[in-house]
Amino acid sequence: MKKILILIPALNPPRQLIDYVKSLLDNGLKDILLVDDGSKEEFREIFDTVEKIPNGNIKVFRHAKNLGKGRALKNAFNYFLTLPNLAEYSGVVTADSDGQHRVEDVIKLAKEVEENPNKLILGCRNFDLEQVPPKSRFGNKITNGAFKLFYGKNISDTQTGLRGFPTAIIKDFLDIAGERFEYETKMLIYCFQKEIGIKEVVIETIYFNDNSETHFNPIVDSIKIYRVTLSPFLKYIASATSSFILDILSFKWILAILIAFGNIEGATVITISTIIARIISSSFNFYLNKKFVFKYEQNTKKSLLKYYSLCIVQMLLSAVLVSIVWKYTKYTETGIKIVVDSALFLLSYFVQQRWVFKRK
């Protein structure tokens, strides 16, 4: 079995970090890298003590100021990839500094990294257990639900700090933006987009002192994480809005040109202008959705055919539903169309995600 580097980012860690590192060493995990992410001066003694523990290859990488967990991980990944004996390692396992990840579970992930050289390994907790703090249970349930809704992926523990990174995929994660806790969320999204496999491994769920040692800011970091999670849908809205504006402008310009230079009148010129404008705006919308919203890099012809099939079905559904609702209610056609098309707009997002731009 190859070596594994245990990476522990730490900010003002508890003293039990010393015993935790000793336990890792006692269980054969000899290569350990700690990142002191700008801890206060009174915590320096803890890092110095850990660095002097015998019978291991322990290094402490220090930040002059707190740069965030995302930056700590990226700097450590970069250090790992520059090791002269990199070929001796199967990869990296990250663990939290508060000791909430059992040594047995760290070993479990190390083995999974060895056996799955092209997958991200997640050590996943059970949030239905009684010992889980309510705020942690609620936060993870919401985040996991958002991933299922907006990405069509079921990740049971999106915020786990116990992760395994095979050497072959680590370089990819250096390009991901994010300096704090949102970086770990972006990792998962990146894996979805680049079709990097994710394997979940069940680990023991441990919380000390109601998770009071965490440096996770429930307001600031939650906002960043949810902003990242909702990013594709927000881009989808922006794509649709810009395409709508282009459709109106194209219709106006084409209509003016046909009236000025063509011998066409009445409904015919409106129909032709509408068709040409819709071809322009829908092509633009397809490009934006493929390139920026869903970041789909596979068969363009196949996805284009699916996209226009969806457009036709969506148009027919709109006409049928508006007609039916109008027939049996007293509401105006325009008001009904706004409601119906808004619902179809939301439905279209999920159809595009799960069918038009579905990854293998």
Where are these regions (language model features)?
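Cell-envelope/extracellular polymer assembly enzymes that use nucleotide-activated donors
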Residues: 3-5, 31, 186
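Short, well-formed alpha-helical segments that are part of the catalytic scaffolds
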Residues: 12-26
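Active-site donor/metal-binding and catalytic loop motifs
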Residues: 199-217, 295
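Conserved donor nucleotide-binding strand/loop of the catalytic core
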Residues: 47-87, 91
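Acceptor/aglycone-binding surface of glycosyltransferases and processive sugar-polymer synthases
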Residues: 65, 71-80, 89, 103-181, ...
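Catalytic donor-sugar/metal-binding loop of nucleotide-sugar-dependent glycosyltransferases
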Residues: 154, 176-179, 188-206
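A conserved acidic beta->alpha catalytic loop
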Residues: 36-47, 65, 99
